[in-house]
Each structure stands twice: as structure tokens, then as C-alpha cells.
Amino acid sequence: MSQFDTNKLNEIDINKVSLSEVISRPNPNKQVVELNRTSLYWGLLLIFVLAVLFSSYIFN
């Protein structure tokens, strides 16, 4: 067996995976996203500062 044939055996055939198996599997990367008050204020400040900086381009 050549090196190409060995690599071919290790690959997963995507056509053999059914859609129901993909949907039923839980997402291992699912994490809770936290938005506390400090992050909210930093985000609002960032949006306000960017709005002030780009207002000259918008209202020109």
C-alpha cells in the first residue's frame, strides 16, 4: 500500500454521516456568554466614541 492509500483510509467519508446524526450531537463548544454591567458600559462607550469619530464622514 502506498502512502496515499494509507492517508485515504484515515479520512472520514462525509457522505456516510447522516443529517440526523449531525443534528443530534451536542455542541461541545457551547459556553455561556456573560455580559456584565462593566462590559456593557465599555461597549456603549466604544460605540459612542466611534460615532463621534465617524460623524464627520456621515454628515459631510
From Swiss-Prot:
Location in the cell: Plastid, Chloroplast thylakoid membrane
Membrane topology type: Single-pass membrane protein
Keywords, sorted A to Z: Chloroplast, Membrane, Photosynthesis, Photosystem II, Plastid, Reaction center, Thylakoid, Transmembrane, Transmembrane helix
The organism's taxonomic lineage, starting at the top: Eukaryota, Viridiplantae, Chlorophyta, core chlorophytes, Chlorophyceae
Keyword check for S-adenosyl-L-methionine: no
GO biological process: photosynthesis
GO cellular component: chloroplast thylakoid membrane; photosystem II reaction center
Name the record gives this protein: Photosystem II reaction center protein L
